[in-house]
Amino acid sequence: MLQQSPPSISPPALLTLAITLPVLVSRHTLPLATFYGEWTAAVLCVALITASLLQRRPASSSNPLPFLIVLIAASLLQALTGTTDLSGSRLATLAVLLLCGAMTGALRLYLTPPSDNQRTALLTGLAYGCLIAALLGALTQWFQLFRLEPDSFHLVSPYFYDTNRRLWGNLNQPNHQATVEGLALAATVWLASRGKLRFPMWLGAVILLESGIVLSGSRTGVIHVGIAAVYALIAAWLARNNGGCRSHPMTRPVGLVVAAALLVAVLLILQPAISAAGHAFDWNLFDTVAELQAADQTAARVSLWKHAWLMFKTHPWLGVGWGEFGWYQFEQLKQVGVTVEMSLHAHNAILDLLAKTGIIGAGGVAIALSVWLWRVVRERLIRGDGEERRQAVVVLTWLAMLCTHSMLEYPLHYLYFFLPFCFMLAWLEPARPSRFTVPGWLVRALGVVFVVVAGWVLVTMWQDYRRAEAREYADQAHFDKLPMPRFWFREYAEADRAQRTTLTPENAAALLPAHIAAVHLLPTPTMIARSAWLFALTGEPDKGREWLERLRYYYAGDEARQYAWVNRSCQNVAASARPQAFCDWIARKARKTRAVEDADSGDDNP
């Protein structure tokens, strides 16, 4: 008898899991709220790479996407030229870029020689993954609407705001949840056009998905509905010579035109219906329509973009580095002169790349993606047959949604969005004639090395995050007994330790570097005030005043509380060690803001 090979999960099935599970992870903790979801995405990506390499003996060369190589090269150049990286973000970014490079390379090998069946199976797996993730995510939003999280067996992330509620599912970010639901809307059209979703199931899915978009209060989600409707019209045009099937009306052009109209109509019906129900039952939902009509809806983004542009102008070639956006934003608060929310990203992918990687990084990415797009349009849309065009259009629709979101936020900084983004780029990449082959033994050897290294990284990341997390939530009595992270997230643990330490004139000089590093990690009002006091204690009162004065441009900078704390610190230190001129200035500032300070005056250590 013939021996059967051991059962294994196919790459399309693993792809569905890799899309679905990470965005459904409900656990969010400090110091990195998205760690568990992103770690899950990385684990499943490694599994997908391994499964892809095991499916066949690759016989041709395969390179990762050029834009990934550009970003890796820019990161290495930053390291070689001494660009600051006190936050430790460069190493983590390199690890992510290498993981995505391995995934795209494995996908290209898996699809060599080109196989229509394999390409279609992967696309179907991707569509099902988007749909399942979004449907379950929308259900979690309804759980949150009725405050049922305590009865969900920890499967639903808690929602903790009482007013202007924008329900976020398990992603803890409403715009991200809306993007997942937008991707799923396009997936429903694709699956229905293939006869895999009958009309009643399709309509039910659309109603649930668009209810999730309404509950998220996301303006980006409204745009996604429009993109999905346009895709349905394009799909109808592409299906004009397809004939379709009488038992599946959505495989025909008329059915897809109706789908486009229904996508818009359902949103127009659900928006006022849910709003009216919210007022009737005191759901306290966010008013998306009113926000869309507001004249200043982009003001916060424009302020961030001004900071990003100034970073690019002052660091044009290689940018400020991957983890230094917040630090440079803090440094230039007075120079820009507008009130702004402190952030680690520009909330615009183009400006973010310009600020962080300069002309070399952003320009290289622009060239690489422009060449990629031209090749895709030429080979997939112009020269491709009808089926190839239909498949390419849905993937381009998904990419359009991710890029639209990236113009207003930073979804591609999260693995559960960036990995699918890279996968779609690689899936669309036209096959090129190969000049040389890669021996099977070499591929297997590299695969083993990759699995070992990736396994070590994932295990140590898990261990170190758990250590950083335990320290974050520990009380002071047990804090010093807990181990520090060894390889990853040490900067977060150091910042937490610095913030917990009582400041005195005796330890000021020793603690100042750790506080500055913590501000590099994220400039919070608390660390800014503590650092300013340390500057004053170590003979740099002007620097301390400068740091505190920047709080006036810091959205929610909590000036009153920070001035009050520094003022109390001045009063509690011995006169011989007190920087008197600085303390006199602080006393005057504290008096001016005393009315605001009273609410928080009980806190002695911010």
Region spans (language model):
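Alpha-helical transmembrane segments of multi-pass inner-membrane proteins
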Residues: 2, 12-24, 28, 40-52, ...
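Membrane-interface catalytic loops of GT-C/OST-like multi-pass glycosylation enzymes that act
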Residues: 30-34, 87-89, 171-175, 217-224, ...
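A membrane-periplasm/extracellular boundary helix in multi-pass inner-membrane enzymes
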Residues: 141, 236-296, 304, 310-314, ...
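TM-adjacent membrane-interface loops and short helices in multi-pass inner/ER membrane proteins
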Residues: 173, 302-343, 350, 357-364
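Short aromatic-rich membrane-water interface segments that cap or initiate transmembrane helices
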Residues: 28-31, 83-95, 161-177, 293-299, ...
